[in-house]
Amino acid sequence: MAEFEDQLVFNSISARALKAYFTAKINEMVDELVTRKCPQKKKSQAKKPEVRIPVDLVKSSFVKKFGLCNYGGILISLINSLVENNFFTKDGKLDDTGKKELVLTDVEKRILNTIDKSSPLYIDISDVKVLAARLKRSATQFNFNGHTYHLENDKIEDLINQLVKDESIQLDEKSSIKDSMYVIPDELIDVLKTRLFRSPQVKDNIISRTRLYDYFTRVTKRDESSIYVILKDPRIASILSLETVKMGAFMYTKHSMLTNAISSRVDRYSKKFQESFYEDIAEFVKENERVNVSRVVECLTVPNITISSNAE
């Protein structure tokens, strides 16, 4: 009976009153949607297109082995993938083919022949990027507007002067106040990016002589990425609980292991090294050198003398 009475009450409501009621409710809902703060979407960074390595700058035997001769350029991600999937065992250790065909230093070969494959010091898939990077070599020259320019670390001034003489770049006299400023065309930027794997830092196609000099200095600098590093003192291994191997008078550990061990001493909230770590390394790292992980790695290690094997 009660349900029937409710129905009678509902039926007695006029169409005008019902319309007013729903209109008010809808307006409230719209107001709530408008005033509600929507969570801001993170700005998605445009992914930079991956640089293609010219085929002639990749180790010829590697190119031939995987049939890459006709490629217009080889993505470094493809090289990484081919290295990881063809030169490592199922448990992620470098196999015998990799030891023969990839670019290893004499020291690395000696260490691999000394330690057991099960050792955490053995080269594994965490070292793929280093091994893949060694398969590409730096360009020694580039061509532009019918001219050939040679890249030599101790002759960068001559290179810049030659570019100016050939009018491949032009002096911008209006902008040249504290430093000589040059107009560098897009076509030359593309050539440099393709052959040297990075672009010079320009603004509106203008670059200073200092920046251009620094650019050529960086691209002609030899890549010295190491898998193994020499510790300055055996006590460092004890402080950081590192696995090591002794070769002659030197104590080696893996660069990645040392980096990870130091990174673990960084406080996740303050982003600074733990005080106890400061105390432990005080003898080896000066206070003004505790800038970041890579700087501390430099302070705890001896520069390696790299002699590459299997290079072409």
Curated annotation (Swiss-Prot):
Location(s), subcellular: Virion
Molecular functions per Gene Ontology: DNA binding
Record InterPro entries: Poxvirus_I1
Keyword Zinc-finger belongs to the record: no
Chief location bin: virion
Alphabetical UniProt keywords: DNA-binding, Virion
GO cellular component entries: virion component
Keyword DNA damage assigned: no
Induction summary: Expressed in the intermediate phase of the viral replicative cycle.
Miscellaneous: Each virion contains approximately 670 molecules of OPG077/I1.
Family the entry assigns: Belongs to the orthopoxvirus OPG077 family.
Main function: DNA-binding protein which binds to the hairpin form of the viral telomeric sequence. Required for the production of mature virions (MV).
Full protein name: Telomere-binding protein OPG077
Species this protein is from: Vaccinia virus (strain Western Reserve)
